[in-house]
Amino acid sequence: PKDVKGTKMLTHTHKKGDDDQWLFLPSLRRVKRISSRSKTSSFMGSEFSYEDLGSQEIDKYHFKWIKNIKSKKGDTHYILERRPKQKSGYSKMLMTISKKMMSAIKIDYYDRKGDLLKTGVFGNFKQYKVGDKKIYRASLIEMKNIQTKKASVFTWKSRKLGVKHRSRDFNKK
């Protein structure tokens, strides 16, 4: 939508504890800090929460392998259960991970009562080089809310990973 065009989000990831997130709102010409209490809130009226768009550090979750499956194309996918160690809007997530890309291609999100809340389907993968590693990241996520029947699509036109910043690159207002 026009009123959210140019919105930018900055996430400072922490291995443990809540990430720091800020949102630049061009229509207001201001930066808004996202409090940890707001992580479960809807991101700009969409089916995504701020938690969905934050870091997915493995140290923040307990994992349990469920099974391996073969896709119709013959690729191996891992099915994992992921439970948050900290307070979350979700009781668990069932993740489908592509062995080839080592990245999630689908996540089922369960609400705090244990009911299926929404499903995220990840697509348009691009490969990035970070240091000496090559990693895949989706440039499109479609989030379908099972309970409300609403859906939202999130796309990245530009993404930079592994960027080194100096503290003077940012200022607090």
Please annotate each region the language model reported.
Residues 1-26:
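N-terminal mature ectodomain segment of secretory-pathway/periplasmic proteins
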Residues 10, 20, 30, 34, ...:
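Gly/Pro-enriched, hydrophobic low-complexity segments
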Residues 58-68:
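Surface-exposed, charged, gly/pro-rich loop-and-adjacent secondary-structure segments at domain edges
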